[in-house]
Amino acid sequence: METCLMRCSHGGIALFRALKPPRNVKLPNSLRLSSMALHTDGGRSVKRAYDALLLDAGGTLLQLAKPVEETYATIGSKYGLSMTSAEIKQGFRRAFAAPWPEKLCYQGDGRPFWKLVVSEATGCADDDYFEEVYEYYAKGDAWHLPDGAYETIVLLKDAGGHIHKVFSSICYLLVLMKSMVFELFSSFIIPNMMSCDTVKVAVVSNFDTRLRKLLKELNVLDLFDAVIISSEVGYEKPDIKIFKAALDQLNAEACKAVHIGDDQKADKVGANAIGVDCWLWGIDVKTFSDIGNRMLISES
C-alpha cells in the first residue's frame, strides 16, 4: 500500500500543485483519521498505545546541567555567600516547603517567587546576586535534554507522517476533481490508511515565561504541537484545567493521552484526575527510549 501510494503520488502531487487548491478547502468528515492506528516502521507493524504525549518540563524534559546548589554557591561566592552546597540544598527544601501566599507560584516571569526562594535558600537578599542566578537559568546552557529525548519525540511525531503527506495530497486532488474514483478510494483505501496521523506531543509545565526561550535555545520548541505553561494559562498542576488546556489544543481525548512527569502530586494526581494516564519519570519510565517503547507497540 505504502509503495503504491508513493509511486502514484509523483504524478498526482504535480497535478495537485497545478490546480493550486485554496488553503481553506476542507475534507469530508469521513476522511478524518481515527486513533490507535497501525503503521509500518522499517517493515515492522507498530500500534500506537496513545494518541497524545504530555511532557513536564523541569525535572523531566529539562535536566539541570549542574546541581542547583553548586551553581548557587559558585555564583554566590562573588557576593560574599559562604554557605556550602549541602547547606544551600537544605535551604531549598525549606524554601519550597514554605507556603506561598499567592494563587500561582509562577506569574509572568516568576521573579517574585524565585526571589523569595533564593533568599530563603541562601540567606542572601542581594538583588544583583538574584539577577545573575535568574538570568543564568534563563539560558539553554544551564539545561540539557535527557539522552534520546529529541530522537524519541521525532520518532513519535513521524510515525506514519510520510504517508500522511502523500495521503492528504491525494485526498485533496480527488475532492477537487470530484473524481468518480473518490467513492472507491473512500470505501476501500481509507479504512486501511488509519496510520496517517501521528502522535501529538505537548509540554505541560508549572513554569514561568522563560520556558519558551529555553526550549528554543535547546532546538526543540518547534517539535511540540502545544506548549502549555502555568504562568500563561493561569493554572498550575495538579489543577485539571491545565491538562484540559493541553488536551483541547491537541484535540485529544483524555483516555488516549499519557503524561510524563516527576512529581507524584502535581503530575500523577493531576493527570489521573482528568482521566489521563501518568508515568512518573525515574520510576515508571527512566529513559525516553522507555517512553518510545511504551508509546509504540510492535505487532506480532
Identify the function of each model-found stretch.
Residues K20, V25-A159, L173-M177, E183-L184, ...:
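N-terminal helical cap/lid subdomain that shapes the substrate entry/recognition surface
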